[in-house]
């Protein structure tokens, strides 16, 4: 196992216009302060205020959006990071681990990773993801990429259909089809930060949001040693070269994770579990009393000193005593949140320290709060009650189905842009208006300048006389639509769908 030295991981250089020379502790901290400014002032963060956490198109400002959730995750991440550093200081290990002059950057990377962790999520959350992937699967049929004979391939896109005698090109076709049918919010976050927003963050800061290490074009089983880390796609084919450079800069082996990402993940797990239940009470899906009974029933028999007793029962009893001039709901969730944090944060911090050799190497194949402990059971309790009583509620399911329909409908509306031939679409991009394509011209005008420029730049890097060019061009054209639609807020997607479907406002 390699020696633990965080100076080899907290890389303050950038992809473009990187600071040069040896830096003092203060200068390095200023570099990460610059990262904070770039992130907090980015449009991608602002858009989170109109993206779903659990309840789509919610007008009640007390119910969480992706932005307020991310701010809560940021605070919990800061708490865990400080707890880890405090414990390492007590153990006199800060200097041994190369952290004595990097405590500020350590905390900042965790905080900003937490704030950014959802920036790639499409409108309507996981149902938006499912809509994008289902729509592309119905046209690209990635499952046919291994079909024999090749005439069985049902892909409706000529450039991506498998052909006899073109094996090198066929392998690229397989990768592209698989990649486009595995849109994922975490992978889109990497694309946003690097390709679309050009935020030029430090290597360490980007490493903090690379939650999953599986490429989106992966086919087959994942290695047992990395099955958790590769549970979902973490980056796209379009960012393959960037991620390869990232691994080199952060000394990460293939499919390994950046150490501070485990802290971001734990902060998210702790935050959303309690928050989803609180939002459900705010939405009147159930009362606090009903929630307590749901939690009690799901946990089962317990001793007086059990974690359930110390966290949930304690919160319930204190809220009923009404010692403060606050509603029972407010008091219950205040105590529940405090009790939960006071138990889970120190536990997550100690898990990080206990498993630091594997975490530093990037190979720890679990979440920090995923084990056989009562702390893990408490998180599972919150999640299970939310799944059973919140996510399955008719109002929630109806809104999710509407969200799925909106995203599917928008993709269908913009489909004419994908139906154009390479030469026709190239002409449209160059002229922006082509008389014989009135619908396509108007659809093209609606695409954002940022996304159009990303498409043009990607194409300009490819030799147009290469046999691979038509494949890559179509890939980036599909990315153009995925980028545009996934970047919408819930409300904008809803309004855009209604406008283009000529539905009454």
Curated annotation (Swiss-Prot):
One of its GO terms (molecular function) is magnesium ion binding. SMART domains: HDc. It is an enzyme of class 3 (hydrolase). The keyword Secreted does not apply. Residues 66-273 form the HD domain. Belongs to the dGTPase family. Type 1 subfamily. This is Deoxyguanosinetriphosphate triphosphohydrolase.
